[in-house]
Each structure stands twice: as C-alpha cells, then as structure tokens.
A protein has these predicted regions:
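Active-site-proximal beta-alpha loop/turn segments in soluble metabolic enzymes
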Residues: 124, 167-176, 208-210
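Short connector loops/turns at beta-strand edges and beta->alpha or beta->beta junctions
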Residues: 81-84, 160-161, 169-171
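Short, flexible loop segments at boundaries between secondary-structure elements
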Residues: 145-161
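Mobile beta-alpha loop/short-helix "lid" or hinge segments that flank ligand
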Residues: 156-164, 168, 205
Length: 210
C-alpha cells in the first residue's frame, strides 16, 4: 500500500519543534507509515540533527514529488528564512514568528494543491507570531483562513477520547456571548459528521457546561 505524503512544518525555529521533527523522522514508527516532507530552514534543521544526535541525511527538494522514501533521509523544502546572526534559542522574536507562519502557510499550500495528503504541525510560539504581526493567534485560525474554512473544528484525542472545543482563544466575556443554543446544536451536528469521516459511526457525546 502506498504511504501517505505528510507535510510537516518545523514550528518555531527557536523552540523544540525542529528537534521533534529530527527525532520523528529518525524513528522506525514514522518511517513505516508515511513519507514526510519537512518545511523549514536548512540551517535550523541541521542544528536540530546535531543537537539530537540523529543519523539523518538531508534531501533538499523543491516539490513533494521529489521526496524519497528512504530510512534516515529527511526530505526538506528549505525556505531559508532565518538569519543565524540574530537567531537565539528560547527567545521570542518576530523573525521566528514570521518564519513559523511561513512554514505552516507553505505546508497548507501544498495540501490545498493536492501535493501532500495531510499536514502535521509542531509547536509554535503565539508571542512570536504576535511580534511578527501575523494576524492569526494560532494553528487553528491559520488553517481556517488559508483553507477558506469558516469556524473550523479543533479536536484533541487521547486514549480513545475525542474532545472538541466550542470556543477557543477568546476572553471569558466573549466565550459567554458565543455559547448559544443554536450554536451548540450546529456544533454537535458538525462534530458528528467529522467523527463519521474518521470512521466513528456510533458513540456517546457528552457536552460540558460552564
């Protein structure tokens, strides 16, 4: 069976995302299930490989169809958008926020064009996004805007339990204004359809109150 092609933006260059990527690509578990296309900055990825000590070879590509399915090979689309002279690990910066956004945007562009089957994200820093004047607060809002999806769903899954969020990234006052009967009914219907797409045909849905 042909493996799906997954785009993975490296997240905030100053954070742990690039190291997570290096460790994931080096793992047998990830290699067995997908062909991964990393979107990031080569200099940052090389540092992540050095820090983690993983035995990885970078295969720099321009398009996902150039990716190779070989153990120990990290397929990379290099956006070359980090200035190492001003870069610092663990620091909030507009440069890193802008870079992180560009990695996500490029990954979504590939998905929208049908060049990859899905996008798997890594950690970003909301303060850095703000410093870069990115007009979105996080992943969900970026995906919603760049896929032209109004009111996108967010779902977490842990130990077989799936959690959807009626509100996110808003103040308590805004949250209270958003919790309306019609919105809840609409959300339950949308969540049910989303679960069906994931293969969940039957189950029990609990709705948490305030």
């Amino acid at each position: 069976m042909k493996k799906p092609v997954i785009a993975i933006p490296i997240g905030d260059p100053a954070g742990v995302g690039p190291e997570i990527v290096a460790k994931s690509i080096a793992s047998d578990e990830v290699f067995q299930i997908a062909v991964c296309v990393i979107v990031g900055d080569r200099k940052i990825v090389e540092k992540a490989i050095e820090i983690t000590g993983e035995n990885l070879k970078i295969n720099e590509i321009k398009e996902p169809d150039e990716a190779v399915d070989e153990k120990g090979v990290l397929n990379l689309i290099d956006l070359d958008n980090v200035d190492m002279d001003t870069f610092a690990y663990g620091k909030v910066s507009g440069m890193c926020g802008k870079a992180a956004y560009e990695y996500i945007a490029k990954s979504i562009e590939l998905a929208n064009a049908g060049q990859v089957d899905a996008v798997a994200t890594t950690p970003i820093n909301k303060e850095s996004l703000h410093a870069a004047e990115v007009p979105y607060i996080g992943h969900t809002e970026i995906f919603g805007a760049l896929t032209h999806t109004e009111d996108p769903l967010t779902m977490f899954e842990t130990n077989g339990m799936r959690v959807f969020f009626l509100t996110r990234h808003v103040s308590l006052r805004q949250m209270l204004d958003m919790i309306k009967k019609d919105r809840i009914i609409d959300y339950v219907k949308r969540c049910t359809k989303a679960l069906e797409r994931l293969g969940v045909k039957e189950g029990t849905m609990a709705i948490a109150g305030l």
